[in-house]
A protein has these predicted regions:
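Positively charged n-region of N-terminal signal peptides that target proteins for export
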Residues: 1-4
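Short, low-complexity N-terminal intrinsically disordered segments enriched in polar/charged residues
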Residues: 8-49
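Hydrophobic pocket/interface hotspot
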Residues: 34, 46-47, 55-56, 71, ...
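Structural motif
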Residues: 52, 98-99, 129
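A short gly/proline-enriched turn/hairpin at secondary-structure junctions
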Residues: 53-66, 80-83
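A mature extracytoplasmic/lumenal domain signature
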Residues: 62, 94, 108-109, 124, ...
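Surface-exposed, charged secondary-structure patches
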Residues: 70-114
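Short beta-strand edge/turn micro-motifs at domain boundaries
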Residues: 119-141
Length: 141
């Protein structure tokens, strides 16, 4: 009986690990799609990674901002053209799947531009919405 219980627990953990791995890969794909869109000066494509909702939270140097449209408008003001956008690079330091629909990501970003190379860190909360991972909370510094 103990052997059967151990086998069942092992199978469950294996399935959980596989599911988590699939979710982590899907999250990396969302972030990579954002990076590619950014580097093609496609701000709308970049915004596809965010939850299109008034409940989206973005925290940057201006403090908390709420909503997809407000976040998009702020990006347009700060990055009006390809030169301002530069080339985005990031390093993912940690992806933690909390459950099947929520995850946190910790990472480092770098913009390579002609005259400077600003950089910082980000913490993202992603949620699986209608089967797709979306950034619902972004704290970037």
């Amino acid at each position: 009986m103990k052997k059967l219980l151990l086998i069942l627990i092992a199978c469950f953990l294996c399935e959980f690990s596989i599911a988590q791995s699939k979710d982590q890969k899907a999250i990396v794909q969302v972030l990579e799609s954002q990076r590619l869109a950014w580097n093609n000066a496609d701000l709308l494509g970049y915004m596809n990674g965010y939850w299109h909702s008034d409940s989206l939270v973005f925290i940057g140097k201006r403090g908390p901002q709420y909503g997809w449209q407000k976040t998009y408008d702020n990006y347009l003001k700060s990055y009006p053209d390809k030169a301002a956008m530069g080339e985005l690079h990031f390093t993912l330091l940690k992806i933690e799947c909390i459950d099947s629909k929520n995850a946190f990501v910790l990472g480092k970003w770098l913009l390579k531009r002609e005259k400077d190379e600003p950089q910082g860190y980000f913490t993202l909360r992603l949620r699986k919405i209608k089967g797709t991972w979306k950034v619902v909370y972004d704290h970037s510094s």
